[in-house]
């Protein structure tokens, strides 16, 4: 049985979750790094998944009108074929299609994700490797297609990219936004679809991990129910602000800012591991 989590740790980790969930820098990787470097232990995959419900509530509220319109449009198209060309109907299917890869892989490899995939050597390496992928997407992407131009193949490709985020250090938004840029989408269109695409996967992941988070059986920091609640509320508030900021930021700024940050962080963590300052597991 792991060590009990302190209130300071819960507050800090909830803040980290809110700040990093929607940025292409890997929230799960940051939670793992901050837990190990500052608190000497891992908060665990279940803590990560449950606090993600806070940030997911933020995206549900921020995009409430879009979500309501998409759901209504999807049902309208099901019963009225003349509406099946509407963007909202198509977007409903794109979210469903894009969720399948992460759902299947997440179920098949859930044990590996909770244990070996949280190794800091892997996380630091993926921070750097995927920074190069994001840089390539920014450089080669045409960035001309609006969200109205989304097609089913875009949903499949971006959904497959989202599945890469099962590896801490990759980043859910980093994977989907990069794929969108490679497909020619504008940064804003890629980011908007990325947020909508994340909703089913993250909600399912958080709900699936909820029982384990309250009664942890493995090693690492064990959060109490009240601590999980507070951390999740903090993640919600900061996550909401992060969504608004990112959507404004990507309109006029490139992804290179995040590339530089990821590389610096990855190098720092690799250095700490190589010198024995922190443990990889």
From Swiss-Prot:
Q: Describe the reaction catalysed, as an equation.
A: di-trans,octa-cis-undecaprenyl diphosphate + H2O = di-trans,octa-cis-undecaprenyl phosphate + phosphate + H(+)
Provide the GO biological process annotations.
Answer: cell wall organization; peptidoglycan biosynthetic process; regulation of cell shape; response to antibiotic
Cell membrane is among the record's keywords = yes
Q: How does it sit in the membrane?
A: Multi-pass membrane protein
Main localization category: membrane
User: Cell membrane as a keyword?
Assistant: yes
**Spans traversing the lipid bilayer:** 89-109, 120-140, 163-183, 194-214, 227-247, 258-278
Q: Which UniProt keywords apply?
A: Antibiotic resistance, Cell membrane, Cell shape, Cell wall biogenesis/degradation, Hydrolase, Membrane, Peptidoglycan synthesis, Transmembrane, Transmembrane helix
Q: What is its EC number?
A: 3.6.1.27
Q: Which GO terms describe its molecular function?
A: undecaprenyl-diphosphatase activity
Note in the entry: Bacitracin is thought to be involved in the inhibition of peptidoglycan synthesis by sequestering undecaprenyl diphosphate, thereby reducing the pool of lipid carrier available.
Q: What is this protein called?
A: Undecaprenyl-diphosphatase
The gene is uppP
């Amino acid at each position: 049985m792991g060590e009990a989590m302190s209130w300071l740790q819960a507050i800090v980790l909830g803040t980290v979750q809110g700040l990093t969930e929607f940025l292409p820098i890997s929230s799960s990787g940051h939670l793992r790094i901050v837990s190990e470097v500052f608190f000497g232990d891992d908060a665990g995959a279940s803590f990560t998944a449950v606090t993600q419900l806070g940030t997911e509530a933020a995206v549900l509220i921020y995009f409430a009108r879009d979500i309501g319109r998409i759901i209504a449009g999807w049902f309208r198209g099901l019963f009225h074929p003349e509406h099946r060309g509407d963007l909202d109907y198509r977007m409903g299917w794109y979210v469903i299609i894009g969720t399948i890869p992460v759902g299947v892989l997440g179920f098949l490899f859930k044990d590996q994700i909770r244990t070996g995939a949280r190794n800091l050597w892997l996380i630091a390496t993926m921070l750097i490797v995927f920074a190069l992928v994001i840089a390539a997407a920014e450089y080669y992407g045409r960035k001309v297609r609006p969200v109205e131009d989304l097609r089913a193949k875009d949903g499949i490709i971006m959904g497959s990219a989202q599945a890469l985020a099962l590896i801490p250090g990759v980043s859910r938004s980093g994977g989907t936004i990069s794929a969108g840029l490679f497909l020619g989408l504008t940064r804003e269109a890629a980011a908007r679809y990325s947020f909508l695409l994340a909703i089913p996967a993250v909600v399912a992941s958080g709900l699936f991990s909820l029982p384990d988070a309250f009664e942890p059986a493995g090693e690492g920091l064990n959060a109490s129910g009240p601590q999980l609640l507070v951390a999740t509320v903090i993640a919600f508030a900061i996550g909401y602000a992060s969504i608004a900021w990112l959507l404004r930021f990507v309109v006029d700024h490139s992804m290179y800012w995040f590339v530089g940050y990821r590389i610096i962080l990855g190098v720092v963590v690799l250095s700490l591991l190589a010198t024995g300052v922190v443990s990889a597991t």
